[in-house]
Amino acid sequence: MAEADPGLPTQAIWDIPFESLEFNEKIGKGSFGSVFRGCYLGLDVAIKKIEKADDPEYLKYIDREVSMLQSLRHPFIVNFSGICVHSSGLYIVTEFVSGGDVRQLLKKTPPIGWDKRVSIAVDLAKAMVFLHAKKIIHRDLKSKNILLDEFQRIRLCDFGFARMSEQTKKSRHMTMCGTEGWVAPEILLGMSYDTSCDVFSYGVVLAELITGRKPGVDLWVRSPETCFDINPEELKQKSIPGCPSELISVCVECCLYEPLTRPKFDEILSQLKVCQNNLKVATAAAAAAAAAAAAAAAVVSTPTIQTPIIQTPNISFSPNNSNNNNNNNNNISNISPDITTGIQQINLSSSGGSNNSSPSTPPQGSQLVSLAQSRRNTMSLHRKSMELNLVDGQLSTTPPPTSPIQSRPHKPSDSIWKIAAKPKHVGYQTLKRKQGPCYAALTSHITKMIERATSDYYYDTSYIQDFLLAYRCFAPPQQIFELLLSRYIANSPDNFTNDINGWKKVQRVIQLRVIIFFKRWIDYYPQDFLEEAMEDNLNEFDKISAQQNSSTALLLGTTISNNELLIDPKLMTELQKKRSELELLIQINSPSDFINNNNNNNNNPVNNINNINNNNSVNSSSSNNNNNNNNNNSNNNNNNNNNNNNNNNNNNGLNIINIAAANQSKMMLQNGNNRYSVLVTSNGIGNGEEPYPVSIIPPPTTSEYLDVKDIHSTELARQITIINSFYFNRIKAREFIEYIWEKCGEESTTTPYVGTSFVEVVPAENIHKFVRKCNNLARFVSTEILKQTKLQKRVATIERFIEAAEKCLANNDYAAVFSIVEPLVDQSIERLSDTWRNVSQRNLATFEHLKSIVSKENDHKKYRELLPDAKPPCIPNIHLLLDELSFIETSSPRLLPGGIVNFFHYRQLSRKILQSQQLQSHCFRPIPSIQKVLTKPPSELFDDELIKNNSLKCEPPVSL
């Protein structure tokens, strides 16, 4: 065997042996661990030791950071050297950057000049252009994560929160992360977000460079009352003298409230390059003017004569202007306003009063200011369309204030609620439910949520679904209706004052969004309109919308066509139509009633087939006997068919009985043992226009119930799935919220909904029924196995359940898989060694595969990997789903301090609920004789004590 080349590494390219690392002084500490200066292969490196290397939640972020750094190579991104796994911990090794970070640089005295500040902004924009081109969102952009080398060139680091932005509909993320003070408002409000959140954080970094202040402490202290919006006027007031106006404009653009109005990093970079060039020109002009002034002063020979007073360009700042000094405003007010124009000016004052100034600002700067102004003028109505105030408990609309400062009230710096008030770096990932004061949801925040749901430029259907599912937890229906009505009749905001036609076009889009919102509301949750005065409100809205449409037609009749006008929504008609549909569903019989009715009228499989197919019968007798019976009893068959039609009409809600009337051909297909009859339909269709599969009819039995071993495994799995599908599809989405309220809610609350209470209504009724059905199926499996006293019958029963579980897995009925396999791995059945020894090898191999799926290892990892790829219809494990929802409920608060709605919490619940509810029925034909076996009364099933005793009877323990 050839020897390995000694010049090649013997380990993986990114693996670093612990012995090769040299640790020096500790240079920092972050949310995931400590950072040391060290040495690797003679090079200075930074070594990050992970404190919680055994925590799977932390390791997820560490693995993400490592994978990101491995794939990134850029001059302004920290270079990754490798990773070291050792018994003492986990270590990430990167290049050592010796210049500290930008936050430390801004604290230095004397402060850095504007050329260096703009250079940092340009370099950071280049790095972000690179990241976004690779579809990477950093999500934790801040000055502490921007390192500086010895030449004060940046290195972007800390990719623990970074994510890939997939090019799909799911590209808008919802995970709440980032650092308080820099995080975008849409993240704080629990809304979906994309790469624009990095643009906002970048704008906050620019604000640090402009003011030298720390966000959330002495700059932009955001509060829930303003929905975490920022005040751009505060930036201009606190900016350091000499700041280029273009830089302020870029910063304000980046920090716009609406994500879609923020610029891309390509645009930001081009604007900053213009600003950088203008600054170089101004600096060169100022230096030339200063040199000329110095030469002129040297010519003057008489010192007693007043000489011109030379004021040098203010490129660097006085040491008295400390970055964190709270008296900066007083210092700034005493400086000439000419310094803040972005062009350094020199005033030469003499007795004659002559002045020489620097060249004027190039036209590119004014164009940028105009560009920023035009972008702000085209902002959506999300911010300014209406200001809703709660006066004496009544909701009223007021015109927007004229002063931009008054329109964004801010709390003082000593306020109880303050972004960045808590030192935790992990931020909103660590929010926990704690005992504390109860808050009422802030009306201004709910208003913002309504504006987002009815936005004229961005329409997010998932946001509307999540809002409608969860809003009852923080607002009554009447309040939501009033906010929607105010949104519908909103007056023209100040940025459309001179463009009434433009405003009317935007208003039509908003009104259309409001109408669509109402229709979705009626379609998804018509029961909400049973609340007091809600029907009257809908009638009133129909009248208002009709008047609005008439006014719009009169005002814009000459500029728009008739087909562009809004159609009267007639919401009350929509509600009545929906209620008519619900009244039909209320008449549905329960599945047990259906089965009992059929079983009372039919005591053999032949009649069961007649009840199902509304046609002729098929049984296991000879074809001649069948023909004779059909001819002699045609009248009876017709009567049976009529009865069956009535039964099916009464049970059409079961989604499993709606069989289309079609010509059906019958044939007898027998397996090797001549035991099963097979029904084949030529034109029969099931739900979704899919053909029903071939039904396998079990042989007749003289006893009350069929024996499980006599039922074909495929048909057994189908009948189990039919029952599970019926119970699961009856669960309403809000029942999950009711269930977790029952399990995790506070004792002081009588309902999870605001303004309502449960009166003669059982919360989460259908969930409890489905849970009981799954538990009864598990008891049924144990009962059917342990009631068999003979070994071969027990073996046949176990093999039948294993085969049925495999078929249920193919049907994506995970609830049935868990209900069947979990009893088989229980000690009472697993101990039956003689029985398991006779099970076939194929079934044993299948059973091992099923055990791996239901295994609790790594928090049901195998099951969680299969579930996202399952195509509907799919029935999840209800127990695990409820546990996940309960964990979300207890892991974060519903309301944040100040009354802000933690909509991220509700969106997590909603996404999990709606993704699990793939409300499609399986296309299987019911066999009542089999369903009768599967729906035995609970009193006929073994309890835990009987299961244990019968297990000992089947195979008594061997005494040693």
From Swiss-Prot:
Pfam families: PK_Tyr_Ser-Thr, RasGEF, RasGEF_N. One of its GO terms (biological process) is regulation of pseudopodium assembly. Transmembrane segments: none annotated. Keywords: ATP-binding, Guanine-nucleotide releasing factor, Kinase, Nucleotide-binding, Serine/threonine-protein kinase, Transferase. Residues 314-368 have a biased composition (Low complexity). One of its GO terms (cellular component) is pseudopodium. It is an enzyme of class 2 (transferase). This is RasGEF domain-containing serine/threonine-protein kinase X. It comes from Dictyostelium discoideum (Social amoeba).
